[in-house]
């Protein structure tokens, strides 16, 4: 029983990371009906932005929670700006083109960020500094959690709650809901659709960057291709929960994290990545719209 509870704790921790990344996928899809396959690479850039921010604030030499928070916020801000540039330069010109054009553009942006990362950061892995010394906290006999895992959980919950409050209780959030329902109607009501789309990309990029920094706190080795598999798994999590549905992305991320850790612990680490695609196949066969998604019939 203690082994199961320990794996559950580990799974929820990883699931919260997948949920943060999946939120970016689901928000962009909800607004644009676009799968932003470059989103996993924003997660990678967030980790590198955090690395350079930690050097700027000398967080490695004098670690503290305040400096760790500064590193996180700086990474989120810089990644949000990168997300804005990507939307303006890459996606906006093809917004009215066929969906295949946008999909090819997304793949191209992903390859550009990955190979650009190799040129800028180098192909060799970099090591993220230990901003917060690791401590282990016993929850139950045989069940423990590190303070870094708690930080991941708490920060993820705070960011998800803040996003929910933003979407439900601010003018911009309500405008995002309106745009997701109907671009033309929202525009006729005086909402700047371009502005809302840009804000959506910025928020999604900031959340992915936060996930990158949080993972780097636990697994300090970072490299330019680190976003490929987490990005794909987060996409599966978004589909699992119902892509375009914000609560669904959170639930899908948690399910993905728990399933991955359980398979690793009880079967073999060999199947750790495979479980994501098994879940994708199952959900597409059983419930294509996802757990919280609604089937929509397109008119021809």
What are these regions (language model features)?
Residues 2-17, 166-171, 197-237, 260-273:
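Inter-helical junctions in multi-pass inner-membrane proteins, predominant
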Residues 4-53, 85-101, 240-246:
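Single transmembrane alpha-helix segments in multi-pass membrane proteins
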Residues 20, 24, 69, 73-85, ...:
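Generic alpha-helical transmembrane segments of integral inner-membrane proteins
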Residues 30-38, 81-124, 166-173, 178, ...:
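Short loop segments and helix-boundary regions at transmembrane helix junctions
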Residues 40-42, 219-246, 252, 276, ...:
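Glycine-rich helix-loop "coupling/hinge" segments at transmembrane-helix boundaries
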Residues 61-109, 116, 251-256, 260, ...:
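Alpha-helical transmembrane segments within multi-pass membrane transporters and channels
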Residues 93-94, 99-169, 196, 220, ...:
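Transmembrane helix-bundle core of multi-pass membrane transporters
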Residues 143-222, 246-252:
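Helix-loop-helix "hairpin" substructures at the membrane interface of multi-pass membrane proteins
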């Amino acid at each position: 029983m203690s082994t199961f509870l320990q794996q559950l704790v580990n799974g929820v921790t990883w699931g919260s990371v997948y949920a943060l990344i999946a939120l970016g996928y689901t928000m962009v899809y909800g607004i644009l009906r676009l799968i932003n396959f470059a989103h996993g690479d924003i997660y990678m850039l967030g980790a590198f932005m955090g690395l350079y921010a930690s050097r700027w604030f000398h967080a490695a030499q004098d670690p503290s929670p305040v400096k760790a928070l500064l590193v996180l916020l700086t990474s989120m801000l810089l990644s949000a700006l990168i997300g804005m540039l990507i939307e303006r330069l890459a996606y906006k010109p093809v917004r009215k083109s066929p969906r295949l054009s946008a999909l090819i553009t997304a793949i191209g942006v992903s390859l550009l960020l990955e190979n650009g990362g190799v040129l800028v950061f180098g192909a060799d892995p970099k090591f993220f500094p230990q901003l917060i010394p690791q401590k282990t906290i016993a929850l139950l006999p045989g069940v423990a959690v590190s303070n870094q895992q708690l930080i991941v959980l708490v920060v993820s919950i705070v960011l998800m709650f803040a996003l929910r409050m933003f979407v439900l209780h601010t003018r911009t959030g309500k405008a995002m809901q309106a745009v997701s329902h109907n671009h033309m109607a929202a525009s006729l009501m005086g909402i700047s659709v371009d502005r809302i789309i840009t804000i959506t990309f910025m928020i999604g990029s900031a959340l992915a960057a936060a996930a990158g920094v949080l993972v780097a706190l636990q697994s300090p080795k970072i490299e330019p291709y680190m976003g490929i598999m987490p990005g794909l798994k987060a996409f599966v999590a978004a589909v699992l929960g119902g892509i375009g549905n914000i609560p669904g992305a959170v639930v899908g991320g948690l399910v993905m994290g728990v399933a991955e850790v359980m398979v690793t612990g009880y079967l073999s680490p060999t199947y750790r990545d495979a479980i994501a695609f098994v879940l994708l196949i199952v959900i597409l066969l059983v419930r294509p719209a996802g757990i919280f998604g609604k089937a929509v019939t397109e008119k021809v």
